[in-house]
């Protein structure tokens, strides 16, 4: 049984193919954090399917692409995969060769051609992405992806197991394993050899000498002068050359192993509220900017005897932490960083995590 997971769960882009005789080989591309649940939604076994797939069912999942660090990065990949002609990045690739002219995927063969083109060219070739084949339709791209060092795994929907992650910054969840009394130990024994600051286990580590670096220091070390994304570089300790995406994969494995040793309810750190390990991201959330308060502000409306509004005094939605404090001395609340793809505000995320695969 193969388990696909990551420190914050699975962020994947999948491809479906229709089994209907009316439109054979018709494909659909989408995003999910749980392929097992998503295919049931598309086949109308449970609620939550897509409008475009309600007519041409039943569907089967051919493959999905995992390894994205955040939900936003996976959604961007899904959009480029669905509409390659609208992306300036894909147009630059297509302009170099007549064979790489891409069109919007309507059939499964076109969708696979676009997928291979995206995964074997930067910037996606520099990310720790992988492909999981779930149907025989996707076997023809296996050799092409493996030639360009893209990990390919073959599985079935029955053997597939998805483990949810934790919606929290990695330095809070994975700072250190919790002690017996439930408190989190934030004392770091490792020191970054570049900046000489303490580093937590959520940072990258050399695969040869096990030296641990700050993720920002290592990123600068692995970034070339003519690139913006870290590619490869040498460890300043053992002088061995590594690829940046390989170090991210190892980091993800360590974070997943550390997550399993953390209790299901994470203790609050630095004012953060406790977070459940079983929480997961929805397949699609409404893209909207939310305020720090979910309740709208209410107005204190005073009316005269005839019912005409005499005055309107807005009532602040910010509650006082101490009833003895007067409203005149109330300080404004510290704003939260709002993720437009989430249904509620959350604190700023620390360096992104990547997906890990364990057998």
Swiss-Prot record:
Amino acid composition bias (Basic and acidic residues), ranges on this chain: 295-306
GO molecular function: 5'-flap endonuclease activity; zinc ion binding
Stretches annotated zinc finger (SLX1-type): 192-238
PANTHER family registered for this protein in UniProt: STRUCTURE-SPECIFIC ENDONUCLEASE SUBUNIT SLX1
Protein name, entry field: Structure-specific endonuclease subunit SLX1 homolog
Keywords assigned: DNA damage, DNA recombination, DNA repair, Endonuclease, Hydrolase, Metal-binding, Nuclease, Nucleus, Zinc, Zinc-finger
Cellular component terms (Gene Ontology): Slx1-Slx4 complex
Organism of provenance: Giardia intestinalis (strain ATCC 50803 / WB clone C6)
Alphabetized Gene3D superfamilies for the sequence: GIY-YIG endonuclease, Zinc/RING finger domain, C3HC4 (zinc finger)
GO biological process: DNA recombination; DNA repair
Subunit structure: Forms a heterodimer with a member of the SLX4 family.
Subcellular location, record wording: Nucleus
EC class: hydrolase
Main location class: nucleus
Xref: CDD domains: GIY-YIG_SLX1 (cd10455)
Function of the protein: Catalytic subunit of a heterodimeric structure-specific endonuclease that resolves DNA secondary structures generated during DNA repair and recombination. Has endonuclease activity towards branched DNA substrates, introducing single-strand cuts in duplex DNA close to junctions with ss-DNA.
Pfam families associated with the record: GIY-YIG
Assigned protein family: Belongs to the SLX1 family.
Biased composition (Polar residues): 269-281
Start and end residues of each stretch annotated as Disordered: 256-359
């Amino acid at each position: 049984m193969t388990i696909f997971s990551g420190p914050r769960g699975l962020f994947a882009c999948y491809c479906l193919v229709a089994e209907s005789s009316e439109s054979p080989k018709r494909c659909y591309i989408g995003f999910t954090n749980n392929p097992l649940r998503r295919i049931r939604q598309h086949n109308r076994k449970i609620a939550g399917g897509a409008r475009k797939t309600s007519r041409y069912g039943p569907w089967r999942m051919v493959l999905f692409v995992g390894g994205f660090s955040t939900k936003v990065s996976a959604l961007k990949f899904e959009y480029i995969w669905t509409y390659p002609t609208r992306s300036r990045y894909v147009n630059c690739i297509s302009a170099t060769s007549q064979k790489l002219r891409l069109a919007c995927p309507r059939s499964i063969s076109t969708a696979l051609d676009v997928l291979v083109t995206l995964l074997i060219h930067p910037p996606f070739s520099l990310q720790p992405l992988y492909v999981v084949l779930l149907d025989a339709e996707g076997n023809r791209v296996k050799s092409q992806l493996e030639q360009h060092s893209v990990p390919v795994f073959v599985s079935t929907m029955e053997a597939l197991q998805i483990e949810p992650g934790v919606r929290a910054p990695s330095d809070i969840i994975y700072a250190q394993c919790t002690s017996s009394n439930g408190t989190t130990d934030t004392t770091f024994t490792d020191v970054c050899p570049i900046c000489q600051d303490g580093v937590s286990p959520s940072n990258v580590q050399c695969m040869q000498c096990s030296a641990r670096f700050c993720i920002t220091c290592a990123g600068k070390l692995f970034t070339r002068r003519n690139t913006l994304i870290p590619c490869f570089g040498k460890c300043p300790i053992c002088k061995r050359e590594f690829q940046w995406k390989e170090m991210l994969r190892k980091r993800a494995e360590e974070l997943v192993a550390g997550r399993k040793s953390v209790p299901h309810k994470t203790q609050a750190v630095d004012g953060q509220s406790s977070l459940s390990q079983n929480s997961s991201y929805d397949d699609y959330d409404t893209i909207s900017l939310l305020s720090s308060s979910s309740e709208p502000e209410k107005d204190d409306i005073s009316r005269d005897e005839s019912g005409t509004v005499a005055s309107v005094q807005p009532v602040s939605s910010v509650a006082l932490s101490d009833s003895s404090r007067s409203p005149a001395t109330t300080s404004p609340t510290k704003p939260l960083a709002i993720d437009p793809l989430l249904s509620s505000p959350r604190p700023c995320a620390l360096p992104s995590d990547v997906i890990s695969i364990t057998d």
